[in-house]
Amino acid sequence: MQQFPRLARVGLGFRRELIPALKSGVPATIDFFEIAPENWIDLGGGAARDLLFFTERYPFVCHGLSLSIGGPAPLDEILLQKIRQFLDQHRVLLYTEHLSYCSDDGHLYDLLPIPFTEEAVKYVAERVRRTQDILERRIALENASFYVASPISDMSELDFIRAVLLEADCDLHLDVNNVYVNSINHDYDPVDFIRALPSDRIVYMHMAGHHKEAENLIIDTHGADVIDPVWSLLDQTYGMHGVAPTLLERDFNIPPLEQLMREVLHIALIQAQHADSGDASAT
């Protein structure tokens, strides 16, 4: 499989609304960008030229939306071939996907949780290995937010994630906000959850905001500022596992670049504090 240079430390989701501001000058704190390949693969014209302008100058990560790695439908190998060509064309450093599914006989337009079972571990792992073979690179799976536990689950979310990583021999894209969301919705300690994850598999992290629907129900929206408990959880995550490349994810209610940069700088500040304290895991 292809080997790629390590990502730098702090990234921002690349959104079309931000392109004019970014063309005027990318702030020095932004080390890399992230896109969903499905949103760009078949585009031509000005959009394609804009993307190439930035991928020629900055490192990029691709975070997939529609592979449906845990879904019952056959793996979309035509899509995977397109993704591989796209990753090669734009020299993308890392490809990640959601540890969930989004299609059955048709696209479901949402990311749904996989039942936490031994059978599902083997099924997902087989599909991940096939994905890695086609893409010719190692991938990372992102822990997903979910709101209703499957009645057929026979293992915990944590045990399921660890088992899939081991069986598939892939890496972990740790979404810190998703852990917080699930900890509120399913009543567990997010620090204990993150502590039990394998440090050597964590290659990438996300930070994002959410919507508080009720006292014991929050929705992962990527449409609001990161709240203090999630910032604290990121700080503790770095303390437990070391600093990994971390991206600010904002998909809705996108504010001006200047406002997003406050949160990007907050990530950089927390990382710097861990570097100053002698954290040996700097990338």
Swiss-Prot record:
InterPro entries hit by this protein: MbnB/TglH/ChrH (IPR007801), Xyl_isomerase-like_sf (IPR036237)
Pfam families: MbnB_TglH_ChrH (PF05114)
Transmembrane segments: none
Similarity remark: Belongs to the UPF0276 family.
Name under which the protein is recorded: UPF0276 protein Nmul_A2550
The species this protein was found in: Nitrosospira multiformis (strain ATCC 25196 / NCIMB 11849 / C 71)
